[in-house]
Amino acid sequence: MLDALRAVILGIVEGVTEFLPVSSTGHLLLTARFFGLGEGAFWDSFIVLIQLGAILAILVLYFERLWRVAIGLFSGDTDSRRFVIGVLIAFLPAVVVGLIAGKYIKSMLFNPWVVCFTLIVGGAVLLWVDQLRLKPREHDATRFPLLMYLWIGIAQCMAMIPGVSRSGASIVAAMLLGADKRAAAEFSFFLAIPTMIGAFAYDFYKNRAEMTTDHLGIVTIGFVVSFITALIVVRTFLDYVTRHGFVLFAWWRVIVGTLGLVALAMGF
């Protein structure tokens, strides 16, 4: 029963934070530290597995759009082919950096102190970018210039540091490069598909010994909760940022990071 409750809580945290610019990894690490949830080899793998629930939410929400791209890709449509190439270009930097420095980053930087500091710094950056008087030139996430896709992919590599936020890094980069807020957020969703599936495949292979059929029920609970939560959050998030920007999420990061530092300093 306790494991099922853990799965529900972690599924909610994952589903709520995965596509918001607040760092799902950071929130999951802090949840494990301060509430004693998700600690241990199995739970490390569990957190990666339930990310697929969040990815499924994106596939469901954007099914029609992605299906058109898939059909266009095989029928020779230039725009569809260009978009797929763009996503692959944006995805490749994370593959390269992950293979070269992934083990070092995980062993040296995956701790709550780093998370809290990066939450605060990332919040300040997000607040700064949101206040800039940018003049967007790109309004369709499927039609960014190819070089723009590359720079977004390079920026996404910063999110390997826990607390930075994959979506936050890609959204900030896209906005600075000329995308409007909605297009920037949508491309971060699309880029998440290969990035998170790749991370899942690598982590699952590496930790496959930790996963048994005994864990199937717990993983299913986390997967379903993550899927439903992400489905609700993504719909709400896009409408909200289009109207109000990212100030709320910036301050959320700063507050959570500050409270985390205070708690750590007090010995929690």
What is each residue range found by the language model?
Residues M1-F268:
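Multi-pass membrane proteins that catalyze or facilitate reactions on polyprenyl-/lipid-phosphate substrates
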